[in-house]
Amino acid sequence: MEENMEEGQTQKGCFECCIKCLGGIPYASLIATILLYAGVALFCGCGHEALSGTVNILQTYFEMARTAGDTLDVFTMIDIFKYVIYGIAAAFFVYGILLMVEGFFTTGAIKDLYGDFKITTCGRCVSAWFIMLTYLFMLAWLGVTAFTSLPVYMYFNVWTICRNTTLVEGANLCLDLRQFGIVTIGEEKKICTVSENFLRMCESTELNMTFHLFIVALAGAGAAVIAMVHYLMVLSANWAYVKDACRMQKYEDIKSKEEQELHDIHSTRSKERLNAYT
């Protein structure tokens, strides 16, 4: 009988511990973090592969080659974009962890008005700093989304030219890289529908794959923007809750101090009456 009671108490203690742990999870921050990681992964992974596919298309079908020396050509720019992608992946991996940790501390402080993190002035400054930083990152991701739409537009034009070539017989269309600013005005890098390279490019799966990779990268950038907006809502709500918790804590401190003073006054009067009676 005693063993069954002990087992029941143990199970009850484990259940209460699990409920307490689940109650301390910042679900809103968790959803935003998952969305951020998914968006950054799609943008960085698909963007990197799309840039590599662009290099292969330029070298294979447009017969472009890397210039010797330190000249800033399209291939150098693509390499720079790849390094930027590496930095974005690492930076936002760390930033997502920081926001999750901040969410855990904030949730714990809201559950307990006398927590040690968000009730302090330093904790409130950290929350305000995260709000400002997340807002700046949201603006940055909006710029990244707008910039990522440019290659999508370029590849859509190329895909449209290839499609029109197959639909309209005898169409003589040309694709000039100078229209997109990829090469300088003095260079003439264009292919027309009558050339073999153009037909090979349109029939290859590489063009279609690169086009869709850029579309997925654009979707990933949009998901990162949504994650930043979600983070802003979560951080702003946490800031409001923490501010109310601070006010409540000050009120409780003042109330307890007044009660202690009243208790001391009553104790002093009781002692005086007792001394006067004796």
Curated annotation (Swiss-Prot):
Q: Which family does it belong to?
A: Belongs to the myelin proteolipid protein family.
Where it mainly occurs, coarsely classed, is membrane
This one is known as Neuronal membrane glycoprotein M6-a
By its UniProt entry, which SMART domains does this protein fall under? PLP
Q: How does it sit in the membrane?
A: Multi-pass membrane protein
Give the UniProt tissue specificity note: Expressed in hippocampus (at protein level). Isoform 1 is the predominant isoform expressed in brain, specifically in hippocampus. Isoform 2 is expressed at low levels in brain and kidney.
Organism equals: Rattus norvegicus
- Which UniProt key words apply to this protein? Acetylation, Cell membrane, Cell projection, Disulfide bond, Glycoprotein, Lipoprotein, Membrane, Neurogenesis, Palmitate, Phosphoprotein, Synapse, Transmembrane, Transmembrane helix
Q: List the GO molecular function terms.
A: calcium channel activity
Asked if the keyword Transmembrane helix belongs to this entry, the reply reads yes
